[in-house]
Amino acid sequence: MHQLVLIRHGESTWNLENRFTGWTDVPLTPTGVSQALSAGRLLKAEGYMFDLACTSVLQRAIHTLWHVLDEMDCSWLPVVGDWRLNERHYGALQGLNKADMARQYGADQVLLWRRSYDTPPPALAVSDPRCERNDRRYAGVPAVPLTECLKDTVARVLPFWTQVIAPAIVSGKRVVLVAHGNSIRALVKYLDRIAEADIVGLNIPNAIPLVYELDANLSPIRHYYLGDADAAAQAAAAVAAQGQA
């Protein structure tokens, strides 16, 4: 049996302010740091060990990983950072308050933008100062997106799974992935074969380790959140409520 551990980053400043974040590189809050440290302590207490860590190129995920590994006494662990694990790009919504958008456009429209499979938000203009196309961390990216739906996020996350994560697991490595709500949703959709119409109901809470037990073909045997299951469910429900006016 193989294991894979998925962790969404700890609370960020824009999580706290209920803003669409996407590719905007915002830091963790003190609560987010505490959440990451708690995740690391929990993993250590439960006896987890890793051989490879994967994360995005956004600091809220990178720093969450650092805190997790530090608490596990394995800051030396090899880390693969890749833009393909970034959060879904929220286009022109980035920086805007979710509740304000729900009041302006309606909760149903905001839910589509946040959680549907194939409805992207309005695109960010190339001339917009928020556009990441001049950010040197993306110099090697063929086409930096101006907006994404979850379908687009799946299209970049799955090649990373195929090229990096799956071969590492098959070779016997224990992998931890620290990323974002939607890049993790993309991977979970693939692993659990969740239908496009059902993915709207999936919410990933901050900094609670999600463990997947996989068979020899990397098909899930079961998955579960470490720690208090009720607390994880409440945290996921809080994420779902962020788009309400």
From Swiss-Prot:
Domain of life from the UniProt record: Bacteria
Pathway(s) of this molecule: Carbohydrate degradation; glycolysis; pyruvate from D-glyceraldehyde 3-phosphate: step 3/5
Top EC category: isomerase
Catalytic activity: (2R)-2-phosphoglycerate = (2R)-3-phosphoglycerate
GO terms classed as biological process: gluconeogenesis; glycolytic process
Binding site for substrate: 8-15, 21-22, 60, 87-90, 98, 114-115, 181-182
Gene3D superfamilies listed in its UniProt record: Phosphoglycerate mutase-like
Active-site annotation: H9, E87
SMART domains with a match to the protein in the record: PGAM
UniProt KW keywords: Gluconeogenesis, Glycolysis, Isomerase
Record-marked site positions (Transition state stabilizer): H180
EC number of the protein: 5.4.2.11
Record-linked InterPro entries: His_Pase_superF_clade-1, His_PPase_superfam, PG/BPGM_mutase_AS, Phosphogly_mut1
MF (Gene Ontology): phosphoglycerate mutase activity
Matches recorded under CDD domains: HP_PGM_like
Pfam families, sorted: His_Phos_1 (PF00300)
Family: Belongs to the phosphoglycerate mutase family. BPG-dependent PGAM subfamily.
Job of this protein: Catalyzes the interconversion of 2-phosphoglycerate and 3-phosphoglycerate.
Name of this chain's protein: 2,3-bisphosphoglycerate-dependent phosphoglycerate mutase
Source organism of this protein record: Verminephrobacter eiseniae (strain EF01-2)
